[in-house]
């Protein structure tokens, strides 16, 4: 089970969970390793990478995921495409895995 130790940001959670499930089911990582990798991915992701991710999600939804469209636009509006907006531990450190 993946849980959080404190309330977390919706957008960063969506990114972390998507990466976690990609690693868990597609790449067949064990859950603890997948969560650790997903946390690192979120921590290190740049504004440019995040905007690209949300744009792909919007495109994959055939234009129906307006939340992804808005998120991509928000990230594109940042001045520094190399900024890491989720680098602070508050966004990723609260996620924990418990289980076999």
Please report, for each region that a protein language model flagged, where it lies by residue:
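Short acidic/histidine-rich active-site segments
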Residues: 1-11
């Amino acid at each position: 089970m993946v849980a959080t130790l404190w309330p977390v940001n919706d957008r960063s959670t969506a990114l972390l969970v998507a990466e976690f499930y990609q690693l868990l089911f597609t790449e067949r990582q064990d859950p603890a390793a997948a969560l650790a990798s997903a946390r690192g991915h979120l921590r290190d992701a740049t504004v440019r990478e995040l905007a690209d991710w949300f744009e792909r999600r919007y495109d994959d939804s055939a234009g129906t995921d307006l939340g992804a469209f808005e998120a991509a636009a928000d990230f594109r509006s940042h001045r520094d495409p190399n900024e890491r907006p989720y680098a602070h531990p508050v966004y990723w450190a609260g996620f924990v895995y418990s289980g076999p």
